[in-house]
Structure formats: structure tokens, C-alpha cells
């Protein structure tokens, strides 16, 4: 399904960047047994447009028609678009371009919390201190519609006060 292709694409990009970079190659040459090497062009039309696309895959099935999973990384912000059911290669390219452009134009990536930076004070019960700084071990971002950006409210949820002792890297809160 389209959702499965999206999940696999995210996994490939995040967990295997060393393989993912191959999807951006516009052509590659491979040796064949008993013949001259073959140079083959990448069939992803978005690689040849001025979008900054760097993958992912094209496809065609009689039932699904033409499909395209495409991705761009613009200033550290990655968008993935997956579509199928297009009647032609041209429609596949045009609609995928429109979808990625829509995402870039109408959405922003907002930083919620920075890794290893305190983001909230948590009340502590029976501790040497009355509160402790809460940290996250990784950067946390949220993609949000630009028109709703000012309405974004981050809520720190915890059952508190948290009983001491609190160990380093202990989960004591959730960001919502």
C-alpha cells in the first residue's frame, strides 16, 4: 500500500542513509557477464527538476497504474510524498511535484525541544531539591501548518510531584 511504501521509505532514509544516497544517482553503470557495461538512467522524473529531490522509487502495476515515492531534503527538513493511481508518467510527475511544493509552501518544521537542553522544571517530592530540570535525549520537531503555527502549544505531562530519587535518563515526563 501507499502507507507501506511511506513507512519503508522513512526507515530506509533514517536507518540506512548509506544505501539511500544511491536513489539520488541520475544514472549508473553496471557490468554484465558476456557483454559491454550498461548505463541506465534513473526513472524518477523529480531528480531532473529543480526541486532538490533525492529519491525514492517509481512504479507501475496494471491495477495501481503509475506510482511514485519521492523525497526532498530542504534545509534539514525532509518531505516524503507517495502517490499511485496516476494515468501516465507525466501525471505522476506533475502531481508529485505539486504535493511536495504544497508541503514546502504550507508547512513548517518547528523545534519543540533541543537535545540535552532543559525544557521544563518538574516538581520533586522528598528530594534534596524541590524541582529538577527535564531534558530530552534527542531533538524533537513537529511539522505544522504555517497558518496554525502561532496556535501551537507544547504541554508537559507528568504525574507529579515525582518521587526522589530520580535517576539520570529516567523518563519522568511526556511532551504533547
What is each stretch, according to the model?
Residues 3-176:
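Domain-terminus/edge residues, biased toward the C-terminal soluble/receptor-binding domains
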Amino acid at each position: 500500500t501507499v502507507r507501506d511504501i511511506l513507512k519503508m521509505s522513512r526507515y530506509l532514509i533514517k536507518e540506512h542513509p548509506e544505501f539511500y544516497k544511491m536513489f539520488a544517482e541520475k544514472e549508473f553503470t553496471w557490468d554484465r557477464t558476456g557483454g559491454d557495461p550498461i548505463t541506465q538512467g534513473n526513472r524518477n522524473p523529480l531528480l531532473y527538476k529543480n526541486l532538490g529531490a533525492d529519491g525514492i522509487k517509481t512504479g507501475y502495476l496494471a491495477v495501481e497504474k503509475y506510482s511514485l515515492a519521492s523525497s526532498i531534503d530542504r534545509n534539514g527538513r525532509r518531505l516524503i510524498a507517495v502517490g499511485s493511481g496516476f494515468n501516465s508518467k507525466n501525471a505522476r510527475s506533475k502531481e508529485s511535484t505539486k504535493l511536495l511544493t504544497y508541503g514546502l509552501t504550507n508547512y513548517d518544521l518547528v523545534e519543540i525541544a533541543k537535545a540535552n537542553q532543559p525544557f521544563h522544571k518538574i516538581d520533586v517530592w522528598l528530594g534534596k531539591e524541590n524541582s529538577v530540570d527535564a531534558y530530552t535525549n534527542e531533538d524533537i520537531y513537529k511539522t505544522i501548518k504555517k497558518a496554525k503555527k502561532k496556535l501551537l502549544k507544547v504541554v508537559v505531562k507528568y504525574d507529579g510531584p515525582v518521587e526522589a530519587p530520580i535517576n539520570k535518563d529516567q523518563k519522568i515526563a511526556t511532551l504533547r
